[in-house]
Amino acid sequence: MSQPNVSVKVGNVVFSNKAPLSLIVGPCQIESRDHAFEMAGRIKAIADQAGIGFVYKSSYDKANRTSLSAARGIGLEKAIAIFADLKKEFGFPILTDVHTEEQCRAVSSVVDVLQIPAFLCRQTDLLVAAAKTGCVINIKKGQFLAPWDMENVLKKVTQSGNPDVMLCERGTSFGYNRLVSDMRSLPIMSSFGAPVIFDATHSVQEPGGKGDSSGGQRQFVEILARAAVAVGVAGIFLETHQDPDNAPSDGANMIEIDNLQRLIEILMNFDRLTKNELNIHA
């Protein structure tokens, strides 16, 4: 089994480059049980009203923070209980990122998608361990890699027996503390056969741009998301928060949840136009 599935189903949510757009959306990290439930409830209500499928995302450990003093999250043990309760309460599929082989095994029982962070996307043992859990795998493209380099990364998962894998574009290093989004990477990675996701919030990040933390340019999230959907992708990855300027991590990139519904509606309109055009000329 070495070919990826062109369509990946996560619960009731379908990710395919030719199917209607789906979302991966949630706060950067689990700040508390109450905050996780508040955000989850609001996101689900917005997505249900818009009529779009989504996977809820949140991190239990931000292991690659800029400085040692930065808030990393609540940790794996507490997160496992919260993820289980979120799924029981709301019924949606859940994504979280993993950093070690041991974490893959520990968290795979309560989440549906294991995400490989961009900085770790070439770590063979991590990819193989994630693949063997049977969860869907979402691999962030390293900021240091060309899009065609991701074909070998993809094969590490599929050749380990897991065809349910997605590739995620999140920007490319462009000098110091800057990322740019090369939209050519989306069709290039799509050509490998797997669904492609565009991370619209981390793509505007300024890594280490504030000295002891990362900055970001939130005002460009919508612009880049529209561009990616116009190219044609399976899904958009968005981080959101009720008060991003005071969030413990990635606040400069996250969109305010009050603006989420409007953005989703815009992206769905772009997606309908794009997919109709692609299907006409297929």
UniProtKB/Swiss-Prot annotation:
E.C. designation(s): 2.5.1.55
GO MF entries: 3-deoxy-8-phosphooctulonate synthase activity
Subcellular location: Cytoplasm
Family the UniProt entry places it in: Belongs to the KdsA family.
Catalytic reaction equation(s): D-arabinose 5-phosphate + phosphoenolpyruvate + H2O = 3-deoxy-alpha-D-manno-2-octulosonate-8-phosphate + phosphate
Gene3D superfamilies the UniProt entry points to: Aldolase class I (3.20.20.70)
Entries under Pfam families matching the protein: DAHP_synth_1
This protein's GO CC annotations: cytoplasm
Range of residues in the leader sequence: none
Organism, as annotated: Bartonella bacilliformis (strain ATCC 35685 / KC583 / Herrer 020/F12,63)
Any one GO biological process: keto-3-deoxy-D-manno-octulosonic acid biosynthetic process
Keywords linked to the UniProt accession: Cytoplasm, Lipopolysaccharide biosynthesis, Transferase
This protein's pathway: Carbohydrate biosynthesis; 3-deoxy-D-manno-octulosonate biosynthesis; 3-deoxy-D-manno-octulosonate from D-ribulose 5-phosphate: step 2/3; Bacterial outer membrane biogenesis; lipopolysaccharide biosynthesis
Protein name: 2-dehydro-3-deoxyphosphooctonate aldolase
InterPro entries registered for this protein in UniProt: Aldolase_TIM, DAHP1/KDSA, KDO8P_synthase
Name of the gene: kdsA
Source domain of life: Bacteria
